[in-house]
Each structure stands twice: as structure tokens, then as C-alpha cells.
Amino acid sequence: RDIAFGPKSMKLSEAEVDERVREAAQFVGIPEELFEKSPLELSGGQKRRIAIAGVIAMRPGVLILDEPTAGLDPSGCEGILQNIVDYRRKTGSTVILVTHSMDDAARIAERIIVFADGRVAMDGAPEAVFSRADELLAMGLDVPAPTSIAKALRQKGLSLPDAIYTLDQLRDAVLALAGGGGETC
């Protein structure tokens, strides 16, 4: 019912509403058996998924998501992030992800805007932003775990690039130093 609210307010046919509800529910991983449950019977993660599905069902050209992975387990978090990427690719929509999770931003963002004290402090591609890890930390923000690990390894004398922000990049850089050429073990 909650997922259908937006499409119904758009005065779509019942068939179109039903199609959009099922498509959006599938997108966020909500099984059909939850469709008729009361919101009081749902977990926090299920409620968050239903809220996201309600927006997706409207097929917006610009999708703004505020902390969409909050309250989700790691598997649910990864699923939502991948679905956001898939949605952007499939629809060509602009997706604005508001998050404090730099790991989430590192995984899916094409552009990152960092705000500090109500002003834009940084604006650029992930590699440009995360190469300024010390500034991010000084602002009280975390950096992706691979960035922290790479920084610690640089402090121990390893010659690693500044712009490491994903596990794949970290793995490839360490293997390249070891003569492995970036191939997986």
C-alpha cells in the first residue's frame, strides 16, 4: 500500500500502479508476501526498503536518497547500493546520495560534494576527494577503509598512490608493489 501511494497520486491505471509496485519492490528486495503486512509488523530495514520502493515506483528523473543504507545489514546495504547503480544505468536518472558513509560514496559515486560548516569544502571525482584524506579527517569525516589502510601503509614506507579508495584499488596497488601486477590471488 505504501509503495502504491505515489503512483496512485499520479492518477495511473490500476494495472500501471500494480506493475510499478511490483517492479519497485523487486528493485529493493521486498518479497510480495510483505505487501499486505502492516508497517508495524516490519523491521526497520524493511520499512526503509519500502520507503525507497515508494519513490522508485514514481520513476523520478532525479532521485534523492538520504542515508538509504542506514539500518540495513551488510548484505542489504550492498544490495541497495548495487540497485542504485543499476537504476541510474537503466533510467539515466540523476541520483543524489546524501550519506556520511564514505565507503558507500566511494563504491558508487561519480562525483562527491563535501559540505563543512554549510559550505562546499570539496567537489570532484572520488579519486580527487579521497586523495585529500587528511583534510577530510580534519573536518571530522571518515574516509573509506581502503584509504585509511593505504595511508597507514604509506606511513610505513610503502609507495602507494594517494587516490586509493576501493578495496580493488588497494589490492592492485599492493600486488603491483609485490610484483604481482594487480592480479587477484
Where are these regions (language model features)?
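Conserved ABC ATPase "signature" region
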Residues: 16-33
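Catalytic Walker B motif of ABC-type/P-loop ATPase nucleotide-binding domains
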Residues: 63-66
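Hydrophobic anchor residue at the start of the ABC signature
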Residues: 52
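Helical segment within the ABC ATPase nucleotide-binding domain
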Residues: 78-90
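Conserved catalytic motifs of ABC-family nucleotide-binding domains
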Residues: 59
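Conserved ABC ATPase signature
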Residues: 38-42, 46
